[in-house]
């Protein structure tokens, strides 16, 4: 394993941590509607749980309402139940074969709670990135110990890994700040 291999491995794993954070932040509800909020809601379809997006067409009616159009009419009831029973705090309204999902306005207290959750997600991502940095630095030290690379190469490798870490942490901070601003916007 070379310095470049260690650097590339650290970079790809850090990028996966950022992707995970992005997914986790997208699940946190703001006051605005977006179809992605229903991505992890599962509905029973012929005996097996499937995401709502696979059994219905999801559209945004306006900034605060999602329209759910089931592909099969008999699925309207189960979809409505699945959305209501999810942990999102949504109250769908059935209009015949279409379901409207209005996004309730967030209270100030709920907004503060959500910003704490966002900060916590960001901190978890930073810890993951720092752990990856530590693993990369340990791998570099092992290469020096095994006399595969020189100490100068190790130092250069550590500098590169540190730059990757700094960039990842800056990206995490930016994502967290954007999400907090989105939540606090009334």
Curated annotation (Swiss-Prot):
GO terms for biological process, alphabetical: cytoplasmic translational termination
Main location per the UniProt record: cytoplasm
A Pfam family recorded for this sequence: RRF
CDD domains linked to this entry: RRF
Residue pairs linked by disulfide bridges in the UniProt entry: none
Alphabetical UniProt keywords: Cytoplasm, Protein biosynthesis
Cellular component, GO annotation: cytosol
Cellular location(s): Cytoplasm
A GO term, aspect molecular function: ribosomal large subunit binding
UniProt record similarity statement: Belongs to the RRF family.
Function as written in the Swiss-Prot or TrEMBL entry: Responsible for the release of ribosomes from messenger RNA at the termination of protein biosynthesis. May increase the efficiency of translation by recycling ribosomes from one round of translation to another.
Protein name in UniProt: Ribosome-recycling factor
Organism: Bordetella avium (strain 197N)
Gene designation: frr
